[in-house]
Curated annotation (Swiss-Prot):
Protein name: Cell division protein SepF
Organism: Rhodococcus erythropolis (strain PR4 / NBRC 100887)
Primary role: Cell division protein that is part of the divisome complex and is recruited early to the Z-ring. Probably stimulates Z-ring formation, perhaps through the cross-linking of FtsZ protofilaments. Its function overlaps with FtsA.
UniProt keyword Metal-binding, yes or no: no
Taxonomic lineage of the native organism: Bacteria, Bacillati, Actinomycetota, Actinomycetes, Mycobacteriales
Cited Gene3D superfamilies: SepF-like protein
Positions of the UniProt region annotated as Disordered: 22-126
Gene it is expressed from: sepF
Keyword S-adenosyl-L-methionine included in the entry's annotation: no
Matches recorded under PANTHER family: CELL DIVISION PROTEIN SEPF (PTHR35798:SF1)
Ranges of Basic and acidic residues composition bias in the record: 28-50, 62-80, 106-118
Length: 216
């Protein structure tokens, strides 16, 4: 069949019986041929690709393996408890127990230096200066005597209450600043004591009884 006749038969220009397609059977043959070929490959695959038996590779033990084996042998050894050796140095004798274990207690046990008493053996109230200020302007004199380390008795009887209160406030601040003491011994009579002077209650009573005669 010529190509022209095939073309006419394809588009319905000639009867279909006259059209002989040489390719009708070829697709079936083409489909069957790969199937047979595939079956052959399957047989060859089953026959040729057999899983080989892998043999265990042999290698020389490394340094780490030897160390691990050494640790295993160490763990299997019997354990021996060691007794700590006693020191040849003699033990220190314990110190006598005090009131506590703090360092504050040790310092507290030290003897404190007592401040010199106001009244000494040379004479009663020999170290005291008695001042009877008339106004607040005399506060400077009181401060200078107290700063020099001399106990000062302030007799404020002749002052007004307002000025006396101002002078008492000044003396109290002065004693606090110089770490001294400020005590009342009688009505409107006060004692300023420096830091190194210790005034007891008995001495304050004696100061009040003497009438503050030791004036300077």
């Amino acid at each position: 069949m010529s190509n022209l006749h095939k073309f006419k038969a394809y588009f319905g220009m000639v009867p279909l019986d006259d059209y002989e397609d040489e390719y009708v059977e070829e697709p079936d043959q083409a489909r069957r041929a790969p199937r047979r070929s595939h079956d052959g490959y399957a047989e060859r695959d089953d026959r040729e690709f057999v899983e080989p038996a892998f043999s265990k590779a042999s290698y020389a033990p490394s340094r780490r393996d030897e160390e691990d084996a050494e640790f295993d042998r160490y763990d299997s050894r019997p354990r021996v408890d060691t007794v700590p050796s006693r020191s040849s140095r003699p033990a220190m004798a314990p110190r006598p127990a005090s009131r506590g274990n703090l360092a504050v207690d040790a310092r507290a046990e030290r003897p404190e230096a007592r401040r010199a008493p106001v009244v000494d053996d040379g004479g009663p109230l020999a170290k005291i200066t008695t001042l009877r200020p008339q106004s607040y302007a005399e506060a400077r004199t009181i401060g200078e005597r107290f700063r020099d380390g001399t106990p000062v008795i302030m007799d404020l009887v002749d002052m007004s209450n307002a000025d006396a209160k101002r002078l008492v406030d000044f003396a109290a601040g002065l004693a606090f600043a110089l770490r001294g003491s400020f005590d009342k011994v009688a009505t409107k009579v006060f004692l300023l004591s420096p830091a190194d002077i210790d005034v007891s209650a008995e001495e304050r009573r004696r100061i009040a009884e003497t009438g503050f005669y030791s004036q300077k």
